[in-house]
């Protein structure tokens, strides 16, 4: 049987352990590539070699987004200017939506769901590497990640206070 005293009992709420994530809707043209994004290639030659394969993947992603009717995962960005954001995670999603808007005339994909984080250049680069941690990668991409993360951890240990030294 329900107790009437439970209805009026004041609950003590536990403090939120995690910050609230707020989705901001940002036009795809306001989202700029992160210079640390290595999956498109780092040199002109590498970009040329990867261009066709990346385009195929982004068209397939555009098809999936269209089938879902929305981008189902927020992009992670940081503000770099008054009305400009740098993508930390979500480059392919942005490019897939660009295909939907510019080539398939579907304006409803012009605004992308984004979480805005206040990150230093070092943390932004590190997060760019770590956010690609679970995707299938070539040996080259794995090497870029490991070298980049290792360099950041050695060069800027103060940016990673939660990691044990050594």
Task: List where the protein language model places each region.
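Short, charged/polar connector segments at secondary-structure boundaries
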Residues: 1-113
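Amphipathic, charge-rich alpha-helical segments that serve as recognition/docking helices
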Residues: 95-166
């Amino acid at each position: 049987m329900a107790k009437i005293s439970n209805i009026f009992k004041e609950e003590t709420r536990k403090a939120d352990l995690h910050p609230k994530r707020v989705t901001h809707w940002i036009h795809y043209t306001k989202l700029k590539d992160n210079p640390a994004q290595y999956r498109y290639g780092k040199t002109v030659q590498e970009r040329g070699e990867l261009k066709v394969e990346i385009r195929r993947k982004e068209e397939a992603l555009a098809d999936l987004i269209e089938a879902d009717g929305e981008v189902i995962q927020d992009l992670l960005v940081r503000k770099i200017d008054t009305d400009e954001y740098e993508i930390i995670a979500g480059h392919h999603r942005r490019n897939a939506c660009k295909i939907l808007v510019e080539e398939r005339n579907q304006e409803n994909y012009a605004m992308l769901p984004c979480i805005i984080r206040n990150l230093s250049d070092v943390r932004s680069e590190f997060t760019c590497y770590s956010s690609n941690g679970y995707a299938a990668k070539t040996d080259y991409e794995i090497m870029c990640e490991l070298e980049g993360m290792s360099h950041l951890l050695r060069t800027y240990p103060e940016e990673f206070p939660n990691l044990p030294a050594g």
